[in-house]
Amino acid sequence: MIIAIAVVAGFIMDILFGDPSWIRHPVVIMGKGISIMENALRRMFPKTDRGEFAAGLVMTIVLPVLVLAVTAGVCVAAYMVHPGLCLAVETLWCWQAFSMKGLKTESMNVYRCLAEGELNDSRKAVGRIVGRDTANLDETGVTKAAVETVAENFGDGVMSPLVFMIIGGAPLAMFYKSINTMDSMVGYKNKRFLFFGRAAAKLDDFVNYIPARLGGIMWVAGAMLSGYDYRNSWRIWRRDRRNHASPNSAQTEAACAGALGIRLAGPAYYFGEYYEKPYIGDAINEISYENIRDADRMMYCAGIVAVILAVTVRAAAVMIISAAGA
């Protein structure tokens, strides 16, 4: 019961408050831990391809286990003091595991800049939430980047944390966030991280595999509830969900592109290098900055559906287990 209440309460608090700057976010602490571990492990292991991979593998194993142990220990200790304290801790960490409000806030900053005709400001705004080069993007390019990041990060910021927390509460959600944070910091295929970050990137792909696919289905449901073309969303999801170098990223992007009848992805520049990427979706409609608002609406509807279903499934599972043990 504590986990179900914490999930719902945390989700509502994320919708209402996002990530207030006055509350220290666990991801910030994880990020500092990753930097410290990277520096220490690089000194401990040989400066060879194998040595860097081994160093990264050690961090990939140690950090998530450490995060899980600490957060679970805190929750157990809180429960021993009072179940209400445990609920408060679980709710706080579930709240911080979600990032839906933050995605909406950042994407709407891009929307406002485009609506006001401030292309340079919109490039800077979208540059804060995407990895591609944004300095030379036109209005369509900026809009595509914003829509793609809303859709893709629905997986990392809503669906995956939800799946983990509904199974094992806030500690398992923080376990997931530590893996996702490692990937965002070291999971690059550049000279510095090609070998060191490989284990973290592969683990992130693994833990996101099922949530990403559930996220695509939830996005189709969100499209239906918010009045968009859910039939085309389903069709494009089934057709284009593998059109990405990552096994997970195109799942929600495809559903979003289909719902809006637009074409996303395609070639882009990253760190000054040109990358040929497949397109996602069909260019039925012209891309408009209003699509950013559309994506946010679908994200919220998809998130609400996902939370309701997750809590329902957990409640049913608990009832079945209780009945079997009676």
Name each region found by the language model.
Residues M1-F175, I179, G187-A326:
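Hydrophobic alpha-helical transmembrane segments
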